[in-house]
Amino acid sequence: LADKLTASVKGISPAGVAQLSQFATSIAFLSQGVPFMQAGQEFLRSKNGDDNSYKSNDATNSIKWSTKLKYSSTVNYYKGLIALRAAHPAFRMTTTAAMKANIKFFKGSDTLIAYSINGKAVGDKAKTIVVIHNADTAGAEFTLPNSGSWNILAKGSQIGTKTLQVLKSGKVVVPAQSTMVLKQ
């Protein structure tokens, strides 16, 4: 993923690669179905642009474990993302009928994907979970579907099972090219 991002986004910085890697992976891991990631993706593994590395040497294909320390914030993001998915059955529905009945998508801009999950109906501790993916290069405002307080579980470069912030208002600003997850 890191190589693809580097090749696709002209002039992207290492921090930009990390942010987009977190964003792209959050989309996959917070979707229904079985998520998948490549070995070393959590620490931005690179094969130096070799897109057909099965024929390449060990220097290209080996996992450089030293980069795990260098990109520890991204490693921690992936850990938090996996923990969040594991803690909430709402992200792991097993039938199409359950998904159709309990996921509601909201209309918005072309750069925003937002949906709510009826957690209560699928045995989740959270009554409602809202996931917002903002692909825009600027922050995006979103109006939450229900009144009351919301616990933010993912915002910017932080994600996990612990509440990052309690929100009392009905609107949030989702940082650029990131995912926000809230629960009630």
Model-derived features with residue positions:
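Solvent-exposed beta-hairpin/edge-strand motifs
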Residues: 145-159
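Loop/helix patches that line or flank the sugar-binding groove of alpha-linked glycan CAZymes
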Residues: 1-149
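Short, polar loop/linker segments at the starts of domains and inter-domain junctions
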Residues: 5-14, 159-171
